[in-house]
Amino acid sequence: MAAPQEESLLARCEIPIIDLAHIGTDVCPMKSVVRRIGQQLFNALSTKGLAVLVNHGIADEKLKAVYSDLDNFCALPENCQAQYLRNPVNNHGYVKPGMEQFDATAKELRHSFNITSLSAASMPAQEEVPEFTQHAIPLAQDLTNLSRVVLQALAYAVGVAPTALLASHSGMLTADGRNPSTMRLLYYPPVPPEDEGYCCQADAVHYTRCGAHADYGTFTLLTQDSEGGLEVKLNGSDKWQKVGHLPGAILVQAGEFLAAWTANVLPALVHRVVVPSGAYARARGRHCVAFFCHPDNDAVLPTLPLQAAAAPPPPTFTPHTHLTLHHRLLNAAHHLQKRFRETYA
């Protein structure tokens, strides 16, 4: 029996849905369609802070394959997993529960595998997780291409040449390490029912799936196989709201860099993943793929020349005081390394 639909932003039709059909490719997009999508995306991110992309061309079978591969990786003995632990130099590799912490008051229950290089040598071995590399690399390439389309759409919307943002993001997932963009595979394991074990109602305050934070980069593309606890604070609000789940869709939201470039016209929403209520949601794991689109390490970018109305009030959650929202230059690598130091144990 299907789980009942929880009250959520998607269920209330409060997240704009953007149709990418007929947009073409990242190399040769349809300019008129890209302009339209850019304006829709700008309107969505400036008013709601997030949007949903449909007809994006990434097959659900590709996502299911990497979800299964991550399950198989998480089932390996710890000594096998340890060979692939995250490299702090390039952010590539396995992040076991507890390594990355956004909420110091709660244990965060998740596994993730960061992919910052498409080299087969950096992936789990074929004999340990068959086809991990064969599944992960094409998906990473698809999400990179989709990110290039989004960058061109945003460029049109803010009044700059589409090549401007492409040039500052030219190194996504290249082997030379000049760009920290990351495809992250995420698995949130099931938790016991609310009346027993850890995460019971009396102890739930000590556990979460992912603590509150805003993403660090330009924007994030997110796929998910179920609702599973994702919540956001809409711009100017202190209220946590469930996002919900639209099968086959990709969520997009701005990161701290895009917020800084646009003087917070396109704000970076604070979000978290909580341990869900209800037996059905708790008994199943949650899988996601997040593609964090970042500028190149040496990109130094001023505020964009927006053709837009005045910015909305800044979000109430603003812990990153080193990020300016004014006409000051911002270095991508410095910002990212600072944020990694704050979140990795």
Model-identified regions with their sequence ranges:
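A short, charged helix-loop
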Residues: 112-135
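C-terminal flanking tails of non-heme Fe-dependent oxygenases
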Residues: 1-103, 133, 137, 144-345
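Core domains of carbohydrate- and sulfate-ester-processing enzymes
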Residues: 101-111
